[in-house]
Amino acid sequence: MKKNLNDFKRLLLTACCTLVLSCGWATVNEKPFVIPELKQWSGAEGMFTPSGKYVVKGGKNAQDVAKLFAADYRDLVGKLLTPKTGKPSAGDIVLVLQSDRKSARLLGKEGYRLTIGDVTTITASSVEGLVWGTRTVLQLSEQQRSAGFVLPKGSTQDKPAYGLRGFMMDCGRKFIPMSYLRSLVKMMSYYKMNTLQIHLNDNGFRQFFGNDWAKTQAAFRLECDTYPGLTAKDGSYSKAEFIELQKLAEQYGVNIIPEIDVPAHSLAFTHYKPEIGSKEYGMDHLDLFNPETYKFVDGLFKEYLEGKNPVFRGKVVHIGTDEYSNAKKEVVEKFRYFTDHYIKYVESFGKQAAVWGALTHAKGDTKVKSENVMMHCWYNGYADPKEMKRQGYKLVSIPDGLVYIVPAAGYYYDYLNCQYLYDSWTPAQIGNEKFDENDPAILGGMFAVWNDHVGNGITVKDIHDRLFPALQTLSAKCWTGAATSFSFEDFNRLRLSLSEAPAVNEAARWQKGKQLRIETLNPGQTTGEKEVGYGYRVEFTIEGADEPKGTVLFSSDNATFYLADPESGQLGFAHEGYLNKFNYRIEKGKKVTLAITGDNRKTCLYVDGKLREELGPVTLYAMLPKDLATFQKSDATATQPIVYNPSAKMHYQRTLVFPLQKAGDFKSRITGMKVEQE
């Protein structure tokens, strides 16, 4: 009996030790990294291995989300997800759309619940929430490429701190191709950013155009039947493709806010109809006292808002209303009348009106409607956000000193200070005013790209280089708010592991270690690569031939690299209307090794291993008569130099994302080509 008791004690001790050891070694999965960060995570043990099957519960809307998810999964990881019916099995992904009150109360409009066990289940009470849940699964999957796209087991109930999370693109001063806007919708969706504002009209600065309003760049980018000839000729959107953009955005959970900016920033309209321009405040201002102004603007908005299927499909339309003169009380009151009129005019078509904050700058007596009006608070001197809250406006936090990008302008940010924003900012901070994190007056936050300096060499690729890290950062801060738990150092390192979006690579990032090698490049040859982004080196040996002007080495949809540029026959490149040249020509019969390197600041040419020329930023000055510098003459016969002290300058950029799509029709012999990226 004693022996049996001792044996039992030994067995019990062994079992306890085994249990202790197993508990000591067993680990639950820590919160995985995604952007925006999950608001909450309960880790479990082990990994989910996908079977390649998905199950849908919830009707047609859920089926549509599932099809989008399957297509994006294929594009991102290269594997098919196929639908199945019946009970899910281990490895299946289940999408559930349930609209009961309890789910709606727990998850809200955009929340979702993700449970990763033997089966992965995404549950939401709205289409938007279901879309966001699939974005999380996609981001988790792509970070496990080397492990077969497994997912860490655990669960989250995730919903945004702010209901509006967005970005504004200035398409008025610089045309942004529709292809990029479509990519931008997908990028924003991938990072759960739900609002894209498209600034459809604006104009350059008069001082860069000889101080002549008639010569100053101005554009309205949308097809217009009401006013034939109004639409910009250097790039525009047809109504049909603008509608298709909005439909695409709807699928991806993104709201498009179109903006027609009046009554300032309106030079495109006064170019078309000069009599509605202000003689007192400048032709970029509409004349608020001219009845023809209201007829014109009414007709413009009406074209895009009327009918059962209007061009502007979304719930919100932005009417501008920023930066008009407040020089006289009478003009302030008329500006307030104008603002109120167009808020109500837009609302008469069933839309919510949005405005730029201006009513502190234009403080007056004329009442301006505030109920259900969205106000973008960009500068507290123009609109005191706490006063605007008191008046009843719904605020969008877009403080210029923190979240405005003006590429290469030398004022505002060229690249946002993402570390400061990540560590210290949320939409509750508008300029120097701090609101409570849950203040219902604040709808959310946005950032913006303003293309102020027309003609400064900035391309869409340059804009994208500035935009994308800001998008990732604002995504985190508008969804997770003040509750981010990853350090900025970890965030900044780990964000690089994520794609821009499924099947989107606007930066032309190559996988680490990838190279393109071509032993002999033949005229007209395709390479299988469209382009290579910043941080590249393109090297080749060339035995020169007599190349006529315009001879192309490589071209893509975005750029052309010339062996002999069309103007002077030098090595150079062109994109988006800009032509940049190296002071170098291909010499007939001469064999050299050339290398071109490029980053976000410069493009360099090396000849036989030595730097020949660096094309970096160049400061250009507007030489205006008012800037003529005069000096006292020392005597009656002394001559006076003609010199200027320029008040206006821009920084011209000469960057290049190198094209590789197709070789040109050249005569030279090109061998030993190697392309790589840092």
Language-model-detected regions and their locations in the chain:
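Short, aromatic/His-centered strand-loop micro-motif at the edge of beta-sheets
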Residues: 571-593, 617
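Active-site neighborhood of glycoside hydrolase catalytic domains
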Residues: 269, 274-373, 378-392
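Short tryptophan-centered beta-strand motifs in secreted/extracellular beta-sheet-rich domains
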Residues: 196-198, 242-249, 538-540, 590-607
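Flexible, acidic glycine-rich loops studded with aromatic residues
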Residues: 367-373, 380-519
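Extracellular glycan-recognition modules
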Residues: 513-572, 664-678
